[in-house]
């Protein structure tokens, strides 16, 4: 039944019909249907057990979402306020009621929002809803500080919330504040700015009780997704989509969750449901590319990424995405060239990511392609743009160290990176390896042991530690380190480790 959620739900429903007193089985049928995105079937099942005290939280939320979506606000609110269910869902009621009341009494709506306790699971969304309700009243100056606070709390929803506020400020007749909500070089924001500057809304409004409920559920899903367990966050996101089908951010978040749950086909369907005209379509394409890469469907990923870069409005993000796909295919030279195209677009004033990040990606790809002079130039450009970025300092320093180029300067770079990011095990590993290359074995052993303790699963750290221990004459301990490295090793690295375990450290088996 794993993966076939419709079949699972139907089976549970059949079992429930055979044993109507067993509400647990019925609840599982609803849960399976929701998780699989079979919302019509889930609603049919949930409505059949709506009066049951054993109705699951996902089924209850789906019934609320359906009532709000269809404009039956009083019934949806009553379901939220109903006592007897576990867990108690009434903490969602004040926000939803505020949106319902706000149609006729804005001040009463704001009073209802003030009833949400600071420690409530939806407490972080109060500023967001207050700003949106104030904007519905045309009070844009009052809304602005709450909007900015909400953006700061939005996390992974930041761009979506910025776009919603831009829409709301424009609708309230305040174009300057609408534009202020979407400042920045991000491609999503740049695309949105072009529309707002022309006085065109973005289609990203949060403008109804159903929209607000959808966003509440999406925020809860993201919060819960940080903990172990994927089923409830996925269910909440599916319900958020049902409450507000136009909420493309919910589709993108759902795709990311499904991909992490190793359901690539469902994830791709979610990403591909986002229309190309959406301001968030770039995020959806990023998710689609990552899902295809994780599923080893690299030809599909390449076709998609190349297609997007041939359009007249292709952006630096599109070129960077192509670079990511090519890098996943080990076509590193072409990946470096794609990142180079992205850099050129940003340098010409187009929207896109930070140039230092793109230069780092380009340098890394070219270094793997054995185009070291070009790689070094890109990495040095990244360092000039971001002289205190640990990733840049470490990458350039380590690349020089591997080539025996300015070894003293390379160690200084890596030591600086380690001082800036002492908790980063990979950088600590680089520092230990630099100390080894400089002949300071006791110091290198201590540093590499610290790195291994910080990230016990990283193969490279254990291999480095084993090499240094062996060189220091501590060969028994070296074998333990190499055996630990074998756990996650693949292909050439695994073969090198096996050779070391058989014959010890030689110039041919030394880590690069």
Where are these regions (language model features)?
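Structural motif corresponding to the intra-repeat A-B loop/turn of tetratricopeptide repeats
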Residues: 2, 36, 70, 103-105, ...
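TPR-repeat structural position
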Residues: 5, 39, 73, 106-107, ...
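Amphipathic alpha-helical segments of tetratricopeptide repeats
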Residues: 17, 84-85, 151-152, 186-187, ...
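Generic helix N-cap/helix-start motif at coil->alpha-helix transitions
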Residues: 19-26, 52-61, 71, 86-96, ...
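Residue-level recognition of tetratricopeptide repeat
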Residues: 31, 65, 97-99, 132, ...
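Terminal, low-structured helical/coil segments at or just beyond the last alpha-helical repeat
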Residues: 201-216, 459, 471-512
């Amino acid at each position: 039944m794993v993966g076939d959620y419709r079949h699972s739900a139907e089976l549970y429903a059949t079992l429930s019909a055979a044993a109507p007193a067993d509400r647990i089985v019925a609840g599982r049928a609803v849960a399976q249907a929701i998780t699989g995105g079979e919302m019509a079937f889930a609603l049919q099942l949930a409505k059949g057990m709506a009066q049951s005290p054993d109705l699951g939280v996902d089924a209850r939320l789906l019934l609320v979402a359906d009532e709000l979506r269809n404009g039956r606000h009083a019934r949806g609110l009553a379901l939220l306020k109903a006592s007897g269910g576990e867990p108690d869902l009434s903490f969602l009621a004040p926000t939803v009621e505020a949106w319902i009341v706000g149609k006729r009494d804005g001040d009463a709506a704001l009073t209802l929002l003030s009833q949400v306790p600071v420690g409530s699971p939806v407490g972080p969304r109060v500023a967001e809803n207050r700003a949106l309700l104030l904007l519905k009243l045309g009070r844009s100056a009052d809304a602005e500080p709450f909007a900015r606070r909400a953006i700061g709390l939005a996390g992974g929803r930041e761009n979506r919330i910025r776009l919603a506020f831009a829409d709301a400020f424009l609708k309230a007749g305040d174009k300057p504040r609408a534009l202020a909500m979407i400042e920045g070089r991000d491609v999503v924001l740049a695309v949105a700015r072009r529309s707002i500057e022309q006085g065109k809304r973005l289609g990203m409004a949060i403008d109804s009780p159903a929209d607000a409920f959808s966003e509440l559920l999406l925020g809860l899903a993201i919060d819960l997704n940080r903990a172990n367990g994927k089923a409830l966050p996925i269910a909440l996101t599916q319900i958020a989509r049902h409450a507000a089908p136009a909420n493309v951010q919910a589709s993108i978040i759902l795709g990311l969750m499904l991909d992490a749950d190793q359901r690539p086909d469902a994830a791709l369907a979610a990403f591909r449901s986002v229309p190309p005209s959406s301001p968030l379509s770039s995020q959806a394409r990023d998710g689609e590319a990552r899902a295809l890469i994780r599923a080893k469907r690299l030809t599909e990923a390449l076709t998609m990424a190349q297609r997007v870069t041939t359009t007249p409005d292709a952006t630096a993000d599109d070129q960077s995405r192509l670079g990511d796909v090519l890098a996943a295919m080990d076509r590193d030279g072409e990946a470096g060239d794609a990142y180079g195209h992205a850099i050129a677009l940003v340098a010409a004033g187009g929207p896109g990511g930070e140039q230092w990040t793109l230069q780092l990606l380009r340098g890394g790809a070219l270094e793997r392609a054995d185009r070291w002079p070009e790689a070094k130039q890109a990495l040095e450009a990244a360092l000039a743009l971001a002289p205190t970025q640990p990733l840049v300092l470490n990458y350039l320093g380590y690349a020089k160290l591997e080539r025996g180029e300015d070894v003293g300067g390379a160690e200084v770079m890596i030591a600086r990176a380690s001082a800036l990011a002492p908790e980063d095990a990979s950088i600590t590993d680089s520092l230990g390896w630099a100390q080894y290359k400089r002949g300071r074995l006791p110091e290198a052993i201590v540093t590499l042991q610290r790195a291994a303790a910080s990230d016990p699963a990283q193969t490279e750290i254990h291999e480095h530690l084993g090499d240094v221990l062996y060189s220091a004459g501590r060969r028994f301990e070296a074998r333990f380190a190499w055996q630990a490295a074998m756990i996650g090793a693949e292909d050439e690295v695994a073969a090198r480790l096996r050779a070391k375990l058989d014959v010890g450290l030689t110039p041919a088996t030394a880590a690069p």
